């Protein structure tokens, strides 16, 4: 019998979340973001599940794009960080990838390269994130340079990223939007602006393309949920089982450092799954875990391969009882808050030794 820990991936839920993102912005095209192995869900399986819905995909780098091409994904694929070396341009050209451009050296390399066909290019505007891209006062000159290079560049788009769209705090977001609107009008530029939170909460940010990412996988990216974000469905359910039960007297401690101590005679369940699988070691005592569909609290520090829960109030639970660490019935965002982290970290942190089991893989 194999270890019971498994990441159960519901591809129908992924499709429904994508359709929700698409329906939030009916006049935009929605790029499905599948970077970081589809946020830990498996990029090939997720892209294949969306191939009849998504007109394009987005990844961080060339290696991720080539993995999709080798798996038979034929839609356009955007490299969100662009290329890291001019030598990558031959593969970008050969595989008909779209590239972001955020630095002068990339522009120089792109215009020095002789492509078989002009390369679709998305020029990154730093509208306030201050991470990648050209400042507003420098953007137009770069745009004009690329727009004139029709033998090298095609489908030139303005692309940016929002720093605070998740907070529903309008002030900084609207400053970013004002910066974008001025350039967009002067350049008559097609745009890709909205990430997941902007797709869900800021219709004015919906452009020619949107980039839903974490919302596709069922995590609510908004600090304050709205009706649309509440409709998202979990795609990954991290499942396990109780593999042992311990009876503790009052005052006995559990786990490394004895952080949790029984305040009464207690039943402790041991779950297969720990930080060596991607469950966050910083989870606090009381972090919710589902056992037999009921919430029980984490009790003690998470170990590499196991964690422990207090089963005292759930006498029917025992060895073999099903466990959900996050997913169906237990939102990953709630677990993340108990770990002082975010859902992105938990999703992408599920390690390779945890098997992925895909449900509803048929497309259509």
Curated annotation (Swiss-Prot):
Molecular function (GO) terms for this protein are: alanine racemase activity; pyridoxal phosphate binding
Keyword annotations for this protein, in alphabetical order, are: Isomerase, Pyridoxal phosphate
Residues the record lists as binding substrate = 131, 304
**Cofactor(s) the protein requires to work:** pyridoxal 5'-phosphate
Q: Which domain of life is it from?
A: Bacteria
Question: Which reactions are catalysed by this chain?
Answer: L-alanine = D-alanine
Q: Name one GO biological process term.
A: D-alanine biosynthetic process
One of this protein's Pfam families, by short name? Ala_racemase_N
Q: Which residues carry this modification: N6-(pyridoxal phosphate)lysine?
A: 35
Pathway(s) it belongs to = Amino-acid biosynthesis; D-alanine biosynthesis; D-alanine from L-alanine: step 1/1
Annotated catalytic residues = 35, 256
Q: Mind telling me which GO cellular component terms the entry cites?
A: cytosol
Give the main EC class: isomerase
What EC number(s) does its UniProt record assign? 5.1.1.1
| Record HAMAP family | Ala_racemase
Query: What is this protein for, i.e. what is its function?
Result: Catalyzes the interconversion of L-alanine and D-alanine. May also act on other amino acids.
Per the record, the similarity remark reads: Belongs to the alanine racemase family.
What is the protein named?
Answer: Alanine racemase
Q: Which gene encodes it?
A: alr
């Amino acid at each position: 019998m194999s270890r019971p820990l498994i990441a159960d991936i519901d591809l129908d839920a992924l499709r429904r979340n994508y359709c929700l993102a698409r329906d939030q912005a009916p006049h935009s095209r929605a790029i499905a973001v599948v970077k970081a192995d589809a946020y830990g869900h498996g990029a090939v399986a997720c892209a294949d599940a969306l191939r009849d819905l998504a007109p394009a995909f987005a990844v961080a780098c060339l290696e991720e794009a080539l993995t999709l091409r080798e798996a038979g994904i034929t839609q356009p694929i955007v490299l969100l960080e662009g290329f890291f070396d001019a030598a990558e341009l031959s593969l970008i050209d050969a595989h008909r990838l779209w590239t972001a451009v955020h630095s002068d050296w990339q522009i120089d390399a792109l215009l020095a390269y002789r492509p078989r066909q002009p390369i679709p290019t998305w020029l990154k505007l730093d509208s306030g994130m201050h991470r990648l891209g050209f400042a507003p006062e420098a953007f137009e000159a770069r745009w004009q340079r690329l727009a004139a290079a029709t033998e090298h560049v095609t489908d030139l788009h303005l692309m940016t990223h929002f720093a605070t769209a998740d907070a529903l705090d309008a002030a900084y977001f609207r400053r970013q939007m004002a910066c974008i609107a001025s350039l967009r009008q002067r350049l008559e530029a097609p745009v890709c602006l909205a990430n997941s939170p902007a797709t869900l909460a800021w219709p004015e940010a919906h452009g020619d393309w949107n980039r839903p990412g974490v919302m596709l996988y069922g995590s609510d990216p908004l600090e304050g949920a709205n009706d649309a974000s509440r409709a998202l469905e979990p795609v990954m359910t991290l499942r396990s089982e109780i593999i042992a039960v311990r009876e503790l007297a009052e005052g006995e401690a559990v786990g490394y450092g004895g952080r949790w101590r029984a305040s009464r005679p207690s039943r402790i369940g041991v779950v297969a799954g720990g930080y060596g699988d991607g469950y966050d070691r910083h989870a606090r005592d009381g972090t919710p875990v589902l056992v037999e569909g009921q919430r029980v609290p984490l009790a003690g520090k998470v170990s590499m391969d196991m964690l422990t829960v207090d089963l005292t109030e759930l006498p029917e639970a025992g060895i073999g009882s099903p466990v959900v660490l996050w997913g169906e019935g237990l939102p990953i965002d709630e677990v993340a808050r108990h770990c002082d982290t975010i859902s992105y970290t938990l999703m992408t942190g599920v390690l390779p030794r945890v098997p992925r089991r895909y449900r509803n893989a048929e497309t259509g």
